[in-house]
Regions:
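Catalytic-core "active-site belt" of small-molecule-metabolizing enzymes
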Residues: 2-179
């Protein structure tokens, strides 16, 4: 690797860390908006966003959050063109971001909240590529109706598959799990 390539990689790593710090601070500020990262960093990619997500996950764990699993978004391919995405995406779900539907969930602390209905699955084993339907079903421990309260740190819900990782701080509420 050349000196220029090493310097470029170090600069990119520093930028990703800066973005993660800014996102983490915005999510914890109780309503602070930031300009979309991809408008300030034109080379910011979905892969970079997942690096930011990993750093924010580490920050959450340091705060005492316990990861419970992941939320998979954009599983409906008909929405991809409208939102400029080309594959499903995911975000972490934590013990402090999961709520029972029987308990009221105030919306005041959220930044521009949006509510999305969900079907939630609890997995006992991770699915593997190439599984048939029966094998995939054996990975599922429970199913529940639920909803996701999504918030965005970007003003007016600016969206692009490149810069939005709003799932980092969404809340999920689930009904009773059924085997």
């Amino acid at each position: 690797m050349t000196e220029a390539a090493i310097a470029g990689a170090a600069t990119k790593d520093a930028t990703i860390r800066e973005i993660a710090d800014e996102a983490f601070t915005a999510f914890n500020s109780g309503g602070r908006h930031v300009l979309p990262f991809s408008t300030r960093y034109p080379a910011f990619s979905l892969n970079d966003a997942y690096h930011v997500t990993a750093l924010v996950n580490n920050m959450r764990i340091a705060q005492g959050y316990k990861p419970l699993g992941r939320k998979i978004g954009f599983t409906n391919r008909r929405m991809w063109d409208e939102y400029g995405v080309r594959a499903p995406n995911w975000g972490y779900v934590y013990d402090r971001t999961m709520h029972d539907l029987a308990v009221p969930l105030p919306l005041a602390p959220f930044i521009e909240p949006k509510i999305e209905p969900e079907i939630m699955f609890g997995f006992v084993a991770a699915p593997s590529p190439g599984m048939d339907d029966a094998a995939l079903l054996r990975c599922i421990a429970w199913v529940a109706h639920g909803f996701e309260v999504v918030q965005s740190i970007f003003p007016a819900e600016v969206f692009s598959g490149r810069h939005r990782r709003r799932q980092c701080n969404a809340r999920r509420a689930a009904g009773r799990a059924a085997p």
